Regions:
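Hydrophobic alpha-helical positions that pack around
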Residues: 65-175, 181-186, 196
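Electropositive phosphate-/nucleotide-binding environments in soluble metabolic enzymes
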Residues: 42-52, 76, 131-134, 169, ...
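Short cysteine clusters
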Residues: 9, 172, 244
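Short glycine-rich loop/turn motifs
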Residues: 23-24, 152-154, 213
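Ferredoxin-type iron-sulfur electron-transfer modules and their immediate structural context
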Residues: 175, 182-244
Length: 244
């Protein structure tokens, strides 16, 4: 709480509040369902021991009997890194997931990994489960072991850039500044898409990086994804009505 650790994706739920819940199962989400994003698998591969150690610490803190790492079976290198340390942490196991969308959604992930169903609008803790993002766990590690607050963010910069890459940047820097770290754009009049192509939003080059910014997709303004996001709700409702 003192170091400002929140969920590093989604709604940015304060992490300390999850640590007060007595979950019997904790789940690490390493199932990036959005195309092109590689942030979590890369971070977990590079810092496997630190993140697993933190996950085990949380397991003991909340009194969970089981700690599950939900990871797509296609993340071979990351799985190899995890298997180097898994025996050091009793009660922790890997659950390999298929490469389907939207596996990274926590409700879907909970069902696939545990068989439990979270009701519509409900919270995972109602089913005795607490879910943690990979980068969130790494931030907890840095807060506990190194006493460092969250002042930076890992961001995947992909699509129409010179060198697609995952970078670590200070919170508050602009999207344009982050894209420059990937060598700049390769299209005229680029559109900055914050997040993945399925659930992301159109941003502005001057928008700041926040604690929940996971990715920046640079797309041409006439890309089908951009055009769909620019449709008004009335157009979408008309399409829905015609389909019905």
């Amino acid at each position: 709480q003192e170091n400002g650790v929140v969920g590093a994706g989604g709604a940015g739920f304060p992490t300390y509040m999850k640590l007060t819940d007595k979950a019997n199962t904790i789940l690490m989400n390493c199932a990036e369902c959005e195309p092109l994003l590689k942030l979590h698998r890369q971070l977990l591969e590079k810092h496997a021991y630190e993140i697993m150690k933190t996950f085990h610490m949380i397991q003991e803190t909340v009194g969970a009997s089981e700690a599950i790492i939900g990871i797509k079976k296609s993340y071979v290198q990351t799985i190899h890194a995890l298997n180097q340390h898994i025996e050091e942490f009793p009660g922790m196991r890997l659950h390999l997931l298929d490469e389907v969308y939207p596996m990274g959604d926590e409700v879907v992930l909970i069902y696939e990994a545990t068989g439990r169903v979270v009701r519509p609008g409900g919270l995972p803790i109602e089913q005795g489960v607490a879910v943690f993002n990979v980068e969130t766990l790494y931030n907890v590690y840095r807060a506990v072991e190194e006493h460092k607050p969250v002042t930076s963010k890992y961001v995947s910069v992909v699509a129409e850039v010179e060198n697609p890459v995952t970078v670590k940047v200070p919170l508050g820097c602009t999207l344009e500044e982050v894209v420059a770290q990937a060598g700049g754009t390769t299209v005229k009049d680029p559109v900055y898409f914050v997040g993945g192509p399925m659930m992301g939003r159109i941003g502005n080059g001057s928008d700041p990086v926040t604690k929940t910014t996971n990715a920046i997709l640079v797309l041409p303004k006439d890309h089908v994804i951009v055009m769909k996001k620019q449709r008004t709700s009335s157009i979408d409702l008309k399409r829905a009505a015609s389909i019905c």
